[in-house]
């Protein structure tokens, strides 16, 4: 997935590809939670949420990119990246829940 969006900060600029993947993964997790509950498929939650979506999102890459920015002296960008990653991932999850609840209502 990261090949589609490019590379992160290791030798580059702001880690937008990793941020995008993490927010998208959170959105998909929100959709899955509601869809699985609606369809009676909650038994698949560990497989999909931990396995599939856990492998899709990139928390270890998020950590590396944050430390790389910090060690490069880009403390402001590191703080912005952490704030955007956490805030937008939570917003993405909430948007997925909202969308799926609208579909399955």
Curated annotation (Swiss-Prot):
InterPro entries: FluC (IPR003691). Keywords: Cell inner membrane, Cell membrane, Ion channel, Ion transport, Membrane, Metal-binding, Sodium, Transmembrane, Transmembrane helix, Transport. The chain crosses the membrane at residues 14-34, 44-64, 79-99. The keyword Secreted does not apply. It is found in: Cell inner membrane. It is a multi-pass membrane protein. GO terms for molecular function: fluoride channel activity; metal ion binding. One of its GO terms (cellular component) is plasma membrane. Na(+) binds at residues 54, 57. Its main location: membrane. It catalyses: fluoride(in) = fluoride(out). Na(+) is not transported, but it plays an essential structural role and its presence is essential for fluoride channel function. GO terms for biological process: cellular detoxification of fluoride. Belongs to the fluoride channel Fluc/FEX (TC 1.A.43) family. Fluoride-specific ion channel. Important for reducing fluoride concentration in the cell, thus reducing its toxicity. This is Fluoride-specific ion channel FluC. It comes from Jannaschia sp. (strain CCS1). The gene is fluC.
């Amino acid at each position: 997935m990261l090949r589609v969006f490019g590379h992160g900060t290791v030798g580059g600029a702001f880690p937008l590809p990793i941020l995008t993947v993490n927010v998208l993964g959170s959105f998909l997790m929100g959709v899955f939670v509601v869809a699985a509950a609606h369809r009676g498929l909650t038994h698949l939650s560990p497989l999909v949420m931990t396995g599939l979506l856990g492998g899709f999102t990139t928390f270890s890459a998020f950590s590396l990119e944050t430390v790389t920015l910090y060690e490069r002296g880009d403390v402001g960008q590191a703080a912005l990246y952490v704030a955007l990653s956490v805030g937008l991932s939570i917003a993405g999850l909430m948007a997925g829940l909202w969308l799926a609840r609208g579909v399955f209502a």
